[in-house]
Amino acid sequence: MRESSQIRETTETKIKLSLQLDEGKNVSVQTGVGFFDHMLTLFARHGRFGLQVEAEGDVFVDAHHTVEDVGIVLGNCLKEALQNKEGINRYGSAYVPMDESLGFVAIDISGRSYIVFQGELTNPKLGDFDTELTEEFFRAVAHAANITLHARILYGSNTHHKIEALFKAFGRALREAVERNAHITGVNSTKGML
């Protein structure tokens, strides 16, 4: 089974995270940031991943360190769980509508970290979650996992719906990218490595 568990402790946060790429039944998320918990749960459910997150952070300051560090640990776990990346599709993409909003995510498990994030989040805060942290989370995941990630909000008016569409699209795109493919021998690259 492709899985990874890691702990990251700093003076700002303590993150314990486990990710199972091939088993999506066990999802439990507690970060102390309610909206972020909701988004991570949606990501796991729509990607059919197992995900357990326990996070403690300096949320009395704001949620920035917690959200970013969870992204770092998730990216690290993804990188470790994929091992040598043999036999996977490598690429994945998904459009996801959420009522009036439409989100799109494309992923390349390339071994090169890069992110493009496009979208207007008009409401600056949802509960304890600063909406600008959406981009910070995706950036942290992409850099830690060494993947290329494009996330785009095509349109919408409700900020909650826009972010929800992105997290669901992220789960679905990542599921496609990590899926094993019987037609792929070795790694899906002419270089012979990713």
From Swiss-Prot:
Q: Which family does it belong to?
A: Belongs to the imidazoleglycerol-phosphate dehydratase family.
What is the source species? Bacillus anthracis
Q: Which Gene3D superfamilies match?
A: Imidazole glycerol phosphate dehydratase, domain 1 (3.30.230.40)
Q: What is its EC number?
A: 4.2.1.19
The record's disulfide annotation reads: none
Annotated protein name in UniProt: Imidazoleglycerol-phosphate dehydratase
Recorded catalytic reaction(s): these are: D-erythro-1-(imidazol-4-yl)glycerol 3-phosphate = 3-(imidazol-4-yl)-2-oxopropyl phosphate + H2O
Q: Name one GO biological process term.
A: L-histidine biosynthetic process
> Could you tell me which InterPro entries the record lists for this protein?
IGPD_sf, ImidazoleglycerolP_deHydtase, ImidazoleglycerP_deHydtase_CS, Ribosomal_Su5_D2-typ_SF
Question: Which pathway is this protein assigned to?
Answer: Amino-acid biosynthesis; L-histidine biosynthesis; L-histidine from 5-phospho-alpha-D-ribose 1-diphosphate: step 6/9
Gene Ontology CC, one term: cytoplasm
* Molecular-function annotations in GO: imidazoleglycerol-phosphate dehydratase activity
Q: Which UniProt keywords apply?
A: Amino-acid biosynthesis, Cytoplasm, Histidine biosynthesis, Lyase
Pfam families the UniProt entry points to: IGPD (PF00475)
Q: Say yes or no: keyword Transmembrane present.
A: no
Q: Does the keyword Amino-acid biosynthesis apply?
A: yes
Where does this polypeptide localize? Cytoplasm
